[in-house]
């Protein structure tokens, strides 16, 4: 929908993406402005501008991976709209009692709805923060008897419900299936969950449905035998999806491989046929597992992801730490692509015309590497230098912000605190916690399904959260202790 909108409005893809990101950065800067309400107006404006600049010039926003024509290009901005809306609402509920909250709730709802529709894992990332913020602010509003503001807390969830129902209705109208996605929910997810139930002799962590489990399933479910040829014998399928090191399909590629095999067999002739087919597969596998005909290692599941087990915990924790360090250092944030495009001239022309945006298809003479002019290389060098400096500063500041916030917690435990003290502390704690949650989510997928290495593309929503945490945390709690003692004297 985003690409179609840009095409209809004749907006260049890269320009529109940058505008979306800058809009989110501006909203976030104004969202946190109540924190410096006691500063002189000119100082407050400087702080707001500084936060906007820190977000707008994030190296992750121009990284080659995040500039791809892909849903993750806009996902960080959509998430930032959501977090900015919730933060702006929470801070105004405490510090600006005469200001309406609904505009901030509407902004949060727009970010939540669009983010949820953009990525299937957005609910696990955004909804915990939304729920916690809503409960905390609701307690504050009830205590102050602000009933209209309390009732307005439903706005983000109502917008999310309307957005999801609208898409489900459109899918039902056009395809005959009332679902938001035919991948992460419904009959295909049920079929994948059923296949992952079948026990296996393999102990390789990346394999969700190993070869020995597939052989058992083919025998128990005749409907899958037509796709077995494509999965087990077709050379092109194996080249596209099979891991040569494992000599099998990783979890992160198997579901795409079996969907393509089903497409080749005409199962995706229409959505209803595909839905019925996968539901039949799911029902037969689950029935065989329940009856003992097929060996089962889990209960009934509806999911495309691997089941969470204790075996993944050490690797997930280690990869979470790797991902967090990856974010702090702005690694893999080069603003250019090191590999030359494999697109044909006709493909590139078609995409360029649709997106109103130029593509670089030039190669260095005698090499299979992309060509960049000396001017471009100079700009890239400046941008990478900025990323290096930003990474060092962010790493130091995150450490300091965590220490100062913990010191503030210790001081709050020794005395009675008001909502003006507690809510900002909890807000920053939530922002930092949700950043770690995102790192952990991506870490689990990496160690259980993908095996592609730590990816900036999937971690890009974390960078702005750490910037918000550092900027607000150091402003609130980062004054030297000696100054605070002098103020209290």
Where are these predicted regions, by residue range?
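Juxtamembrane membrane-water interface segments immediately following transmembrane helices
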Residues: 160-316
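Membrane-interface alpha helices of multi-pass inner-membrane proteins
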Residues: 104-119, 160-167
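Transmembrane-helix motifs of polytopic, lipid-linked glycan transferases
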Residues: 15-42, 48, 81-85
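Membrane-interfacial entry segments at the cytosolic side of transmembrane helices
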Residues: 43-47, 98-104, 142-159, 483
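Membrane-interface transmembrane helices that cradle and orient dolichyl/undecaprenyl
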Residues: 82-103
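Short hydrophobic/aromatic helix or loop-helix immediately within or flanking a transmembrane segment
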Residues: 1-18
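Multi-pass, polyprenyl lipid-linked donor-dependent membrane glycosyltransferases
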Residues: 16-20, 54-86, 114-131, 459-461
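Hydrophobic, aromatic-rich transmembrane alpha-helices
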Residues: 23-34, 380-424, 478
């Amino acid at each position: 929908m985003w690409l179609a909108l840009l095409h209809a409005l004749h907006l260049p893809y890269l320009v529109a993406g940058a505008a979306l990101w800058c809009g989110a950065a501006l909203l976030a800067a104004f969202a946190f402005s109540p924190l410096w309400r006691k500063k002189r107006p000119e100082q407050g404006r400087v702080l707001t501008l500084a936060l906007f600049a820190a977000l707008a010039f994030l190296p992750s926003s121009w990284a080659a991976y995040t500039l791809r024509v892909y849903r993750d290009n806009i996902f960080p901005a959509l998430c930032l709209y959501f977090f900015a809306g919730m933060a702006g609402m929470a801070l105004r509920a405490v510090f600006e009692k005469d200001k309406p909250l609904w505009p901030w709730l509407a902004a949060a709802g727009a970010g939540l709805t669009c983010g949820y529709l953009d990525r299937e894992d957005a609910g696990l990332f955004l909804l915990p923060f939304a729920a916690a913020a809503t409960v905390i602010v609701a307690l504050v509003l009830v205590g102050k008897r602000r009933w209209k503001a309390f009732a307005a807390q439903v706005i983000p969830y109502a917008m999310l419900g309307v957005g999801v129902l609208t898409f489900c209705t459109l899918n039902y109208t056009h395809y005959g299936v009332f679902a938001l996605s035919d991948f992460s929910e419904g009959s295909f997810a049920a079929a994948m969950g059923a296949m992952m139930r079948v026990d296996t002799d393999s102990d390789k962590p990346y394999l969700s449905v190993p070869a020995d489990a597939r052989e058992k399933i083919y025998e128990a479910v005749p409907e899958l035998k037509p796709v077995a040829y494509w999965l087990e014998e077709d050379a092109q399928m194996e080249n596209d999806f099979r891991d040569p090191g494992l000599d099998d399909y990783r979890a992160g590629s198997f579901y795409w491989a079996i969907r393509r095999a089903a497409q080749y067999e005409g199962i995706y002739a229409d959505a209803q046929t595909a839905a019925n087919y996968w539901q039949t597969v799911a029902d037969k596998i689950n029935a065989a597992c329940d009856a003992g005909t097929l060996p089962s290692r889990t209960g009934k599941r509806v999911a495309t992801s691997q089941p969470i087990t204790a075996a993944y915990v050490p690797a997930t924790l280690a990869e979470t730490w790797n991902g967090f360090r990856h974010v702090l250092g702005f690694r893999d944030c080069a603003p250019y692509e090191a590999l030359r495009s494999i697109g044909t001239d006709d493909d590139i022309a078609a995409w360029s015309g649709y997106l109103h945006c130029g593509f670089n298809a030039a190669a260095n003479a005698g090499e299979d590497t992309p060509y960049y002019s000396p001017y471009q290389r100079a700009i890239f060098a400046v941008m990478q230098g900025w990323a290096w400096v930003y990474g060092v500063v962010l790493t130091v500041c995150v450490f300091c912000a965590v220490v100062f916030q913990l010191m503030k917690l210790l001081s709050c435990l020794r005395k009675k605190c008001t909502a003006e003290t507690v809510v900002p502390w909890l807000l920053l704690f939530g922002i930092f916690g949700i950043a770690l949650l995102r790192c952990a989510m991506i870490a689990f997928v990496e160690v259980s399904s993908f095996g592609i290495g730590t990816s900036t593309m999937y971690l890009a929503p974390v960078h702005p959260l750490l910037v918000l945490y550092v900027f607000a945390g150091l402003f609130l709690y980062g004054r030297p202790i000696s100054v605070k003692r002098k103020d209290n004297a």
